[in-house]
Every structure is written in structure tokens, then in C-alpha cells.
């Protein structure tokens, strides 16, 4: 397989074509940003850590029957993934109140949410990823009823799998976002799962172990990413 020209460059990853039209190379970079790109930095080893972390999680999900675009690791920073027709909707599950939920609804950080909440956001940087609902998605043609139902079902299946995984490793999976796409019409998990796109707290101390360390200037961002991975069994 040959890596060809760059197709897309996002905030922290780049996608490259290959000589197989159905496969892409996903490259994880050291770039880090927060607050819609207002705060930016390069964190040494971040690309390598997130690449291996994502490979571990995606493999666990695939073993549990979740359809994923991840195929295999290619290098320290690169993974081979299946080509998806992306659905421009982010699915967010919150097990514990934190971040924007607290600001929007005036609830205290750390409140356990039973049952977990489920929210949809339009993936659009210019509009700052506004919250939407199923009616918007259908009206504007972003997703069909069947796709929305499958995305929701898969998102909660992922929650069941990963909550248990993190809990057994002494951590709380506070919240996370997922993105989906289509392969021959089948809803499939895309993008990545890493501490960049979720909140993780130490169960014993409540210490934040995710991208909030960058957002809130808590320091040792990558060291905590690696600690999360080591507890789960990721080989760095």
C-alpha cells in the first residue's frame, strides 16, 4: 500500500489518500488546541500517544461488535482506516456533569447523571459546533431516522463497554464525543477516541487526566494521557 497526497488536515490529525480508494492513512500530529482554536500549542509525543491510545480503544470496541473504521497501526503516528462518508453530527454522552453542560444548565461539576445524557452537535467549526436535535438533522438532510437511531444505539453501546473498562482501571469516564460515517450505507464509528475527545477523572482523587489539563493549564498533559493508557493496558 502506498501513501499518496494529503486529503484533509484538521486541528490535530491529517488524512492521506492511498493507492486503495477504500483506505486512508490517518496521521496524528502533536498540534493541540482549545476554545475553538484560540489556545494552541504543540505537545511533544502527543501524536504518538493518541495514535496508540486510539488503536487500543478501537480494537476493544471492534472486539465487542462495534463497527469501526480503524484497520491497524502503520507507524508511531499513523493508522490505516477505512474510507467513510462522514455524517456531520457529533454524538455526546455525559455520565457526569462537567464542562459546557454545567455552564448551560447551572448544575454542579461532578454530579452523576442517571441516566446519562445524550446530545447532538453539528460538526461545523465556523459555527462553533452548535447543539442540534434529531429534527434539525432530518430537516437539513444530515442524517436519516434510521441512521440517527443507529448512531444513538452505538453511542450507548460504546458507553457500556468503555465505562466498565475505565472503571476497572480506577478511572471515571465523565463524557466523550463520537463521530460516525457510512460504509456502503452501514453506520460505522469514525474519527478517534483519545483523551483529546473525552473527560477522564481519577476515581480516588478526582484528578483530571484529559485535555482539560491543557484547557485549564494544569500541566503534564501528555504524562497524564500516558498514565490513562497504562492503566487501561495500552503499550506505548
Curated annotation (Swiss-Prot):
Pathway where this protein functions: Purine metabolism; IMP biosynthesis via de novo pathway; 5-amino-1-(5-phospho-D-ribosyl)imidazole-4-carboxamide from 5-amino-1-(5-phospho-D-ribosyl)imidazole-4-carboxylate: step 1/2
GO cellular component annotations of the record: cytosol
GO MF annotations, alphabetized: ATP binding; phosphoribosylaminoimidazolesuccinocarboxamide synthase activity
Nucleotide-binding found in the keyword field: yes
SUPFAM superfamilies: SAICAR synthase-like
EC number: 6.3.2.6
Top-level taxonomic group: Bacteria
GO annotation (BP), single: 'de novo' IMP biosynthetic process
Keywords tagged on the record: ATP-binding, Ligase, Nucleotide-binding, Purine biosynthesis
Enzyme class, spelled out: ligase
CDD domains on file: SAICAR_synt_PurC
Reactions it catalyzes: 5-amino-1-(5-phospho-D-ribosyl)imidazole-4-carboxylate + L-aspartate + ATP = (2S)-2-[5-amino-1-(5-phospho-beta-D-ribosyl)imidazole-4-carboxamido]succinate + ADP + phosphate + 2 H(+)
Protein family membership: Belongs to the SAICAR synthetase family.
Protein name: Phosphoribosylaminoimidazole-succinocarboxamide synthase
